[in-house]
Amino acid sequence: MTDQPPPSGSNPTPAPPPPGSSGGYEPSFAPSELGSAYPPPTAPPVGGSYPPPPPPGGSYPPPPPPGGSYPPPPPSTGAYAPPPPGPAIRSLPKEAYTFWVTRVLAYVIDNIPATVLLGIGMLIQTLTKQEACVTDITQYNVNQYCATQPTGIGMLAFWFAWLMATAYLVWNYGYRQGATGSSIGKTVMKFKVISEATGQPIGFGMSVVRQLAHFVDAVICCIGFLFPLWDSKRQTLADKIMTTVCLPI
C-alpha cells in the first residue's frame, strides 16, 4: 500500500522542536529578562581560579602577626600602671638639706603626745598605789614591814596609756610620714623625708623600718644622731642605711 498525501483541510504535521530543546514548554520569560536577574558568570582570570567570595556580614578577622606570636592580653579589671618615679636626689648642695636643729625640734614635737599619754598612765598608777604591811612579833621586838604596790586599776591605766602612745607613734612615723613624707613635727617645721632614688615618700613599711634603724644611731652613744652636723647630705646613719634625705617643703 502506497503512502497517500493527507487530504486537504486536515491538521498539518507539527513542526520539529528547535535545536537544544527537550521537547517541553518554552520558558515564559525572554532571555533578556533572565540576563537582567542573574548576571552571567565572569570569565575566570588568568591562572584558572576565581577569587574567594567576600564573607557574609562583614570582613574577615585580621591574620595573626608573623611568627605565631600574639600581643599580650590587656590588664585585668582594676589594675593600674605604676606611677612614674620621681626625680632622683643625688647632687644637691649641703644648704639644700634640712638643718640639724630643725630636725631636733621636729623630733621633740613628734614625741610630745606620746610623752603626755605615758605621763597620764604613770600618774594614775602612782595615785592608786596601795600600802601593804607585815608585822613580825618576836619575844623582844615587834617589827613591821610595809611596801606599796600598784592596784589593778593603776596597772590597767598604765598599759592602756602605753598602747595608745605606741599606736600614735606607729601612725605618725609609719602611716603619716610614709604616705606624705612628713610626720606632725616635720609638718610644723616644714620639711619631709624622701627617698634619694625616687624623690618620693618611702611608704608605711619602709618608714617604720627607718625609725627602727635609728637604733644604730643610738647604740654608738647617740653619735649617729649628730652625723647631720658634718655630713654633706646631713644624713643620720639611719638615713644612709635607708637611702633617705630630709628636704625643706
Curated annotation (Swiss-Prot):
Residue span of region 2 X 23 AA approximate repeats: 101-156
Record bears the keyword Transmembrane: yes
Location(s) in or outside the cell: Cell membrane
Residue intervals passing through the bilayer: 104-124, 151-171, 212-232
Region (Disordered): 1-87
Comp. bias intervals (Pro residues): 1-20, 38-87
One family name in Pfam for this protein: RDD
Residue ranges of every copy of the RDD domain listed in the record: 99-242
UniProt KW Repeat keyword: yes
GO (cellular component) term, any one: plasma membrane
Membrane topology (UniProt): Multi-pass membrane protein
Region 5 X 10 AA tandem repeats of [PV]-G-G-S-Y-P-P-P-P-P, residue ranges: 34-85
Sequence repeats, residue ranges: 34-43, 46-55, 56-65, 66-75, 76-85, 101-123, 134-156
Alphabetical UniProt keywords: Cell membrane, Membrane, Repeat, Transmembrane, Transmembrane helix
Domain note: Its N-terminus, which contains the proline-rich repeats, is highly immunoreactive.
Family recorded in the similarity comment: Belongs to the mycobacterial Pra family.
UniProt name for this protein: Proline-rich antigen
Provenance organism: Mycobacterium leprae (strain TN)
